[in-house]
């Protein structure tokens, strides 16, 4: 983990990433607590459709999304199967942003890809001083993360107030692609709304492959620039707007057509 000063100055924006969904009132209640503590807060939903109990996907999207927000944004991510246990809370400064999440590996992708990081565990005395010493056992998003994020976003609390720097946060869940001569082996990390299979293979992994093809589900797929480079119904691979390789099917669902799910192997070779 690289530790360098990451200049953070709160801008009043808070993003939310959870596995709560929108059927129940959990997201609304979190927003209510944020506004109650900081009426001028600007709240942006990144996503509330992370698969239940799967912190790895939350970290994957955070690491590829946070740079699109203004410097000084507080990013709150709550995918917390260990809620109410002895697991701690992680606070990470990276490139002028601040991330709050359970210390369960969720922030691993941020730690792995950011160019400047200061990681902390939120000290118990800080929570006591803020009156966050008796949270419910099952809803720390409301009782801990929301009031903590609001105070930071309002510049009432600085990252340095949260605890001493550490390099011992729980590591991330997503392994790096395996790169060898003429080949990159990765996996499907998630499936988007359109049925595209999103992999952990970054565009940079393809630089050493002059004529890449993708092997997946006993097929070899061409790497193209846009979905319209093939006919409707045809399969292809491309580097998407987040800079990662995805498997797609023009105007169809690649996941349904190929019968693949999260964790499926994907190999890129040169022809």
Task: Please give the residue ranges for each predicted region.
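Surface-exposed interaction regions enriched in Ser/Thr/Asp/Glu
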Residues: 258-271
């Amino acid at each position: 983990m690289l530790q360098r000063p990451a200049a953070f100055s709160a801008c009043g924006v808070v993003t939310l990433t959870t596995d709560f969904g929108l059927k129940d009132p959990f997201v609304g209640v979190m927003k209510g607590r944020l506004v109650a503590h900081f009426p001028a807060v600007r709240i942006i939903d990144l996503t509330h459709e992370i698969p239940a109990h799967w912190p790895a996907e939350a970290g994957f999207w955070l690491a590829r999304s946070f740079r699109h927000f203004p410097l000084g944004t507080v990013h709150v991510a709550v995918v917390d199967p260990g809620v109410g246990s002895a697991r701690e809370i992680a606070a990470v400064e990276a490139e002028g942003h601040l991330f709050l999440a359970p210390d369960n590996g969720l922030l691993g992708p941020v730690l792995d890809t950011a160019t400047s990081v200061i990681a902390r565990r939120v000290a118990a005395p800080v929570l006591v001083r803020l009156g966050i010493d008796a949270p419910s056992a099952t809803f720390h998003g409301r009782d801990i993360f929301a009031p903590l994020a609001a105070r930071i976003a309002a510049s009432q609390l600085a990252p340095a107030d949260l605890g001493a720097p550490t390099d011992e946060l729980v590591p991330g869940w997503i392994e790096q692609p395996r790169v060898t001569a003429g080949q990159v082996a990765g996996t499907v990390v998630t499936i988007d709304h359109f049925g595209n299979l999103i992999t952990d293979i970054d565009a940079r992994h393809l630089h050493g492959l002059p004529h890449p093809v993708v092997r997946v589900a006993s097929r070899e797929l061409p790497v193209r620039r846009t979905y319209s480079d093939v006919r409707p119904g045809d399969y292809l691979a491309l580097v998407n707007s987040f800079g990662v390789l995805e498997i797609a099917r023009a105007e169809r669902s690649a996941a349904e057509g190929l019968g693949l799910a999260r964790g499926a192997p994907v190999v890129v070779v040169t022809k």
